Amino acid sequence: MSISISSTSYLPTDQKIWKNLSLLTKKITFNEYANLHSGFNHNYKIDYSIFIIFFHDLLGINANEKVKIFLKNLKDYLKKYNSNVLVALSNYDGNNNVIENAKNLIINKKIANNFKKNIYKLTTLYNNLLFVDLDLPFSYYGYKEIFDSRNWYTYHMRISYKTLSIIDKEIYQV
């Protein structure tokens, strides 16, 4: 079995961190971070293509366009290949302004919610597509322990090392 992992943020490749997935296979490859599309471009059979998306990484002027491109590439990939695809998403955007969030659904949240809705819709059309909402296990542990801005400046990794074991466990369970 082979697993290919693409992410919007840097993920360490040490097998010890990915201990649950390593139980399934030793053939785990990590694509270039911040380049989700590299996960779609390969000429060999992959049993599981995993896309780990931190929506905060997609924010900016072209966020909506980035989402549309990813969804189009995902649909094309699902039609072309028979491999399993897992999309793991956290749409936490770091905006903890209670007042701002009380009255308006911020445009970034609208885009994130629409993205999630489209992924769920695709899971009904393609049996080989799975979705993991990372915000569910993350909320259990608390966002303060999950996201670590110090890691962003050091490694371009938004999350703590503890979070990596949570992601590994959640993907393994699916």
Give the ranges of each region predicted by the language model.
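Serine-esterase "nucleophile elbow" of acetyl-processing enzymes
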Residues: 1-35, 41
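Oxyanion-hole/transition-state-stabilizing segment in secreted/luminal serine hydrolases
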Residues: 37-69, 90-101
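Well-ordered, non-membrane alpha-helical segments in soluble/globular domains
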Residues: 63-76, 107-119
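A short helix->loop->beta-strand "cap" motif at the edges of active sites that frequently abuts
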Residues: 77-85
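Acidic carboxylate-rich catalytic motifs and surrounding loops in phosphoryl-/glycosyl-chemistry enzymes
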Residues: 91, 127-144
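Substrate-gating cap/lid alpha-helix
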Residues: 97-132, 164
